[in-house]
Amino acid sequence: MIPGELLIEDGEIELNAGRATVTLSVANTGDRPIQVGSHYHFFETNPALRFDRDKARGMRLDIAAGTAVRFEPGQTRDVQLVALAGKRVVYGFRGDVMGKL
């Protein structure tokens, strides 16, 4: 193996297979762009983003790790969210949860 080399199987790789998902319409009501990373607890995003926060609790963007979605001022877009995995304990972010989901 060469350092940094990736060995992957042939075929398609399905991200987040078998996890619960939800699609939400999200509007940036602010005057500045807002970018949300792949593993940010979507429930705790910038308050200028308007969407059904209750449906976003325990969810993150259903996108590849290390990527992000940008919301321009006045823009509304649909995003798919996926359930957080693991112990489903959330600390940090905006401090809205600080414990079990």
UniProtKB/Swiss-Prot annotation:
Its main location: cytoplasm. It catalyses: urea + 2 H2O + H(+) = hydrogencarbonate + 2 NH4(+). Its EC number is 3.5.1.5. CDD domains: Urease_beta. InterPro entries: Urease_beta-like, Urease_betasu_sf, Urease_subunit. The keyword Hydrolase applies. It comes from the Bacteria. It is found in: Cytoplasm. Keywords: Cytoplasm, Hydrolase. GO terms for molecular function: urease activity. One of its GO terms (biological process) is urea catabolic process. One of its GO terms (cellular component) is urease complex. Pathway: Nitrogen metabolism; urea degradation; CO(2) and NH(3) from urea (urease route): step 1/1. Gene3D superfamilies: Urease, beta subunit. Heterotrimer of UreA (gamma), UreB (beta) and UreC (alpha) subunits. Three heterotrimers associate to form the active enzyme. Belongs to the urease beta subunit family. HAMAP family: Urease_beta. This is Urease subunit beta. The gene is ureB.
